[in-house]
């Protein structure tokens, strides 16, 4: 059974693509028709491909690895940050820094610098420096937080990327591909689907469409993590029961 309903996709406008004259011919298999100069996405295919993508993301989440959410366009920023935080995943919703993946060691240095300034605010260091120095450090931290705050806890490269608008996030796509990191993405009719490992043909401009898909990804991760915890608890209980049985047998 699909995790989506056709009606909810229609209400969210998932089926509305771009102007036909701006299309990418490689998206032809996922286009249902052209109406008033606009391509209409085949939602039957979206249903199937979205389920495939979510199943694969579920498998990754169960390993405990991280999935990075990426979406820096205006319509996606708040959705990306809110849903990624709910799922406990790293995210980028402001500017993508070149080398965020391919030069991760340098990015980690910037994150450590950000965390260092944060500690200065609480350990009394700020009381020992001038007002001007404090102001400069606060501004530096705010700048770093704006760009790197979503990946502040990330200690290694993500296991996968989930992207909204691969055309806008082309640098992130290029970096992930060069490192062999699987890419899951909402792909509109003006984008090249061959750049993505798991395509979700969908309107990547409408807020409701973005919300529907990003929420589904976050829900999948949250549910997968909760299931993993439940399985670990049950496994622990089974081990305890087994030890108790062995103890009783030894006592006899």
UniProtKB/Swiss-Prot annotation:
Keyword terms of this UniProt record: Ribonucleoprotein, Ribosomal protein
One BP term from GO: translation
Alphabetical list of Gene3D superfamilies matching this protein: Glucose-6-phosphate isomerase like protein, domain 1, Helix hairpin bin
GO cellular component, one term: cytosolic small ribosomal subunit
Superkingdom, taxonomy of origin: Bacteria
Cited CDD domains: RPS2 (cd01425)
Signal peptide coordinates: none
InterPro entries: Ribosomal_uS2 (IPR001865), Ribosomal_uS2_bac/mit/plastid (IPR005706), Ribosomal_uS2_CS (IPR018130), Ribosomal_uS2_flav_dom_sf (IPR023591)
Pfam family, one: Ribosomal_S2
Entry's Gene Ontology molecular function annotations: structural constituent of ribosome
PANTHER family xref list: 30S RIBOSOMAL PROTEIN S2 PROKARYOTIC AND ORGANELLAR (PTHR12534), SMALL RIBOSOMAL SUBUNIT PROTEIN US2M (PTHR12534:SF0)
Similarity annotation: Belongs to the universal ribosomal protein uS2 family.
Entries under NCBIfam families matching the protein: rpsB_bact
Protein name listed in UniProt: Small ribosomal subunit protein uS2
Organism: Chlorobium phaeobacteroides (strain DSM 266 / SMG 266 / 2430)
């Amino acid at each position: 059974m699909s995790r989506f309903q056709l009606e909810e996709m229609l209400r969210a406008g998932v089926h509305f693509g771009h102007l036909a004259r701006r299309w990418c011919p490689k998206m032809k298999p996922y286009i249902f028709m052209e109406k008033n100069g606009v391509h209409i996405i085949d939602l039957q295919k979206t249903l199937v491909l979205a389920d495939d993508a979510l199943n694969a993301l579920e498998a990754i989440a169960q390993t405990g690895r991280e999935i990075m959410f990426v979406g820096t366009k205006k319509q996606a920023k708040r959705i990306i940050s809110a849903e990624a935080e709910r799922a406990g995943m790293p995210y980028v919703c402001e500017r993508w820094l070149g080398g965020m993946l391919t030069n991760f060691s340098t990015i980690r240095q910037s994150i450590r610098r950000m965390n260092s300034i944060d500690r200065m605010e609480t350990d009394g260091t700020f009381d020992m420096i001038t007002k001007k120095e404090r102001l400069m450090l606060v501004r530096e931290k705010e700048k770093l937080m704006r760009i790197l705050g979503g990946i502040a806890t990330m200690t290694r490269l993500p296991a996968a990327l989930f992207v909204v608008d691969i055309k806008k996030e082309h640098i992130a796509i290029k970096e992930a591909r060069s490192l062999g990191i699987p890419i899951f993405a909402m792909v509109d009719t003006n984008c090249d689907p061959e750049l993505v490992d798991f395509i979700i043909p969908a309107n990547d401009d409408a807020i409701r469409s973005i919300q529907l898909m990003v929420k589904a990804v976050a829900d999948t991760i949250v549910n997968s993590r909760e299931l993993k915890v439940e399985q670990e608890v049950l496994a622990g209980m089974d081990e305890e029961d087994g030890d108790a049985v062995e103890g009783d047998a030894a006592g006899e």
